[in-house]
Amino acid sequence: MIEKREFYSKEDLIASSRGELFGERGPQLPAHQMLMMDQVVKITKYGGHYNKGFMEAELDIKPDMWFFCCHFIGDPVMPGCLGLDAMWQLVGFYLGWIGGKGKGRALGVGEVKFIGQILPSAKKVTYRIHFRRIIHRQLLMGMADGEVICDGKIIYTATDLKVGLFQDPTILS
């Protein structure tokens, strides 16, 4: 049985990337530079806009992060796709937290809006995920809406984020 907590540290998230947090066959987060959060500060089975689950995670921004030196030279900004990927990462993490098994794969998103940006001068990015539905069929799939907040201001929103857990992800090829 997986110990469910409301808070997960950076060390816990790194353990997840090695497959050590959610047990054998549990979903994994990406490792190192592609891990887009430093901690999960809240995770609940109820709550959020739809009372079907909620997560909040944070990333401390440092001016020397890898993407600032290459996106773009002379005009550094965090790629928006990394914020979107962070939201997918969190949906997959939640599926492991509720006991799901398999390899996580992003399956789509309804609509994404970028209304701000993350610059090297930013201090903290907060991600909020509001679960709409969890489907238990041949695969376990989470559906959620998300927000990316930079220093207290909502800068990205996404609707209908979808992540599934697959026993054999090669079926997607």
Curated annotation (Swiss-Prot):
Q: Catalytic center at which residues?
A: 71
CDD domains the UniProt entry points to? FabA
User: Where is this protein primarily located?
Assistant: cytoplasm
Q: Which InterPro entries match?
A: FabA, FabA_FabZ, HotDog_dom_sf
Record has Lipid metabolism as a keyword: yes
Q: What Gene Ontology terms for biological process does this UniProt record contain?
A: unsaturated fatty acid biosynthetic process
Q: What is its EC number?
A: 4.2.1.59, 5.3.3.14
The places in or outside the cell where this protein is found are: Cytoplasm
Q: Which domain of life is it from?
A: Bacteria
Q: Which NCBIfam families match?
A: fabA, PRK05174.1
| Protein purpose | Necessary for the introduction of cis unsaturation into fatty acids. Catalyzes the dehydration of (3R)-3-hydroxydecanoyl-ACP to E-(2)-decenoyl-ACP and then its isomerization to Z-(3)-decenoyl-ACP. Can catalyze the dehydratase reaction for beta-hydroxyacyl-ACPs with saturated chain lengths up to 16:0, being most active on intermediate chain length.
Assembly, per entry: Homodimer.
PANTHER family, per the entry: 3-HYDROXYACYL-[ACYL-CARRIER-PROTEIN] DEHYDRATASE (PTHR30272), 3-HYDROXYDECANOYL-[ACYL-CARRIER-PROTEIN] DEHYDRATASE (PTHR30272:SF8)
Please report which protein family the annotation says this sequence is part of.
Belongs to the thioester dehydratase family. FabA subfamily.
Q: What is this protein called?
A: 3-hydroxydecanoyl-[acyl-carrier-protein] dehydratase
Top-down, what is the taxonomic lineage of the species of origin? Bacteria, Pseudomonadati, Pseudomonadota, Gammaproteobacteria, Candidatus Palibaumannia
